[in-house]
Amino acid sequence: MSIKSDRWIRHMAEEHGMIEPFSPRQVRHVEGNSIISYGLSSYGYDIRCAGEFKVFTNVRSVIVDPKNFSEHSFVDFTGDTCIIPPNSFALARTLEYFRIPRNVLTICLGKSTYARCGIIVNVTPFEPEWEGYVTLEFSNTTPLPAKIYANEGVAQVLFLESDEVCEVSYADRGGKYQGQSGVTLPKA
């Protein structure tokens, strides 16, 4: 298994639609303003989150149960920034849509810019032949409110190509998050 370079990522995005929309370079400024970078890097791709969020709240005193997760645990929010309450979390989705090849596994890691502020992005794989918008989780580990930015870099995806094709892909087994189009809550 090997990590894939910028050349391979660019080719797969431009010729096979692996990442849409795709930025072929690191973007660090928009309209003269500094932003948290996104786009193609040497051995990965920095993704953005869209401006739709679900912010966790316990105002309804529900129990957090991954087998029976209540939508009432979240407040929906749309905007260019999202404030996460202290010691809480928010869900968002990527701006980019992914189509992962059958012989590739990706790993999504948080950006150090956010980690240095106590905001942690979940580590998650995108399995072979998975496609959709990625649901991201941002944990605010601080005792203070924390801000995340839509349309700016939030995490990096690394692409690992196997030396052989898997017998059963995510699509073959009918994975429960296949083709997700928005922020998707846990499914058992």
From Swiss-Prot:
Residues given in the record as dCTP binding sites: K111, S112, T113, Y114, A115, R116, T135, L136, E137, Q156, Y170, Q180
Active-site residues from the entry: E137
CDD domains: trimeric_dUTPase
GO BP annotation list: dUMP biosynthetic process; dUTP biosynthetic process; nucleobase-containing small molecule interconversion
Gene3D superfamilies membership: 2.70.40.10
Keywords: Hydrolase, Nucleotide metabolism, Nucleotide-binding
Catalytic reaction equation(s): dCTP + H2O + H(+) = dUTP + NH4(+)
SUPFAM superfamilies linked to this entry: dUTPase-like
GO molecular-function term, one example from the UniProt record: dCTP deaminase activity
Record family assignment: Belongs to the dCTP deaminase family.
Chain's role: Catalyzes the deamination of dCTP to dUTP.
Entries under NCBIfam families matching the protein: dCTP_deam
Subunit structure, interactors included: Homotrimer.
Name of protein: dCTP deaminase
Annotated source species: Acidithiobacillus ferrooxidans (strain ATCC 23270 / DSM 14882 / CIP 104768 / NCIMB 8455)
The encoding gene: dcd
